[in-house]
Regions:
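Intrinsically disordered/low-complexity terminal segments and short unstructured peptides
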Residues: 1-2, 112
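Extended interfacial segments that mediate partner engagement and assembly in macromolecular machines
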Residues: 61-127
Length: 150
């Protein structure tokens, strides 16, 4: 008994790692302002590292540059709107010797949400920001939240 062979379709040409996906020209390292939406708002990130095609002007981000761009955009958004920074949130949690899971339970959130806030990958809502500030600034608020935790 013979095994049927799969038909192999012709492969698309493979581009070099630094080739523009649009026109194939070698991309060049660049730094400049890139814009990224955060909570529906367009945030300008200065000095963002990226690759730019000198021919067609296509912009491509390396994975690490894309992560950094997202984190920088969120930090700029937080600062513009007066929200606590990722470090501020971590400091509040550590001040009360809470794990991310403990804080998430107190705030009726998933543990991953707190992790994303602290790593700068997501931004907290204004309401959660106020709740975190109350926890930090108002004596007795931790006990109140514990008595009402899920």
């Amino acid at each position: 008994m013979t095994t049927p062979h799969k038909k192999v379709s012709p492969k698309a040409p493979v581009l070099a790692a630094d080739a523009c996906p649009r026109c194939g020209t070698t991309m060049k390292e660049a730094h400049g302002v890139l814009r990224l939406p955060v909570n529906g708002e367009d945030v300008a990130v200065p000095h963002a590292a990226h690759l730019r095609c000198p021919k067609c002007k296509e912009v491509v981000l390396r994975l690490e540059d894309a992560r950094r761009l997202g984190e920088d955009a969120i930090a700029i958004y937080r600062k513009k709107h007066g929200l606590l920074s990722a470090g501020d949130i971590r400091a509040i949690r550590e001040r009360f010797e809470l794990t991310q899971g403990d804080l998430a339970k107190l705030l009726h959130l998933g543990q991953n949400t707190v992790s994303r806030w602290e790593s700068g990958r997501n931004v907290q809502t204004a309401a959660m920001d106020v709740l975190l500030r109350l926890l930090r600034d108002v004596p007795g608020s931790l006990e109140y939240l514990r008595s009402h935790a899920a």
